[in-house]
């Protein structure tokens, strides 16, 4: 059964850009996220509607990523993070300069 509370969670604090990727991965692990890795997409890449079995965190390192869920779209840029709930149908669109981000799940 899919949770009725399927909204994107936006963390408004801007991550310190000097923080190393390792420190960001460590932070995600402290929050209970696992399998963290860096992913890089080419400009204008698109991911059609899909789901993940587990909650997924995305920490944008460079570029931008637009996520759409329940008809709501939000663009995330370097230093921002969004969490997508488990089993939430969503799509993603990458910006004109590509996107490099950490992704992890719990």
Predicted regions mapped to residue ranges:
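A short, N-terminal "cap"/entry segment at the start of jelly-roll beta-barrel domains
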Residues: 1-40, 46-48
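Ligand-binding loop in jelly-roll beta-barrel domains
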Residues: 86-106
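Histidine-centered metal-chelating micro-motifs
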Residues: 46-47, 81-82, 86-91
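Short histidine-centered beta-strand/loop micro-motifs
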Residues: 27, 46-52, 69, 93-94
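Short, conserved beta-strand element in jelly-roll/cupin
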Residues: 51-67
């Amino acid at each position: 059964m899919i949770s009725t509370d399927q909204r994107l969670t936006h963390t408004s604090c801007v991550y310190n850009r000097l923080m190393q990727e390792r420190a960001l991965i460590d932070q995600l692990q402290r929050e209970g996220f696992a399998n963290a890795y860096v992913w890089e997409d080419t400009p204008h890449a698109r991911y059609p509607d899909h789901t993940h079995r587990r909650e997924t965190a995305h920490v944008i390192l460079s570029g931008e990523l637009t996520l759409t869920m329940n008809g709501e779209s939000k663009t995330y840029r370097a230093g921002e993070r969004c969490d997508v709930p488990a089993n939430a149908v969503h799509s993603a669109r990458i910006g004109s300069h590509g996107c490099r981000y950490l992704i992890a799940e719990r």
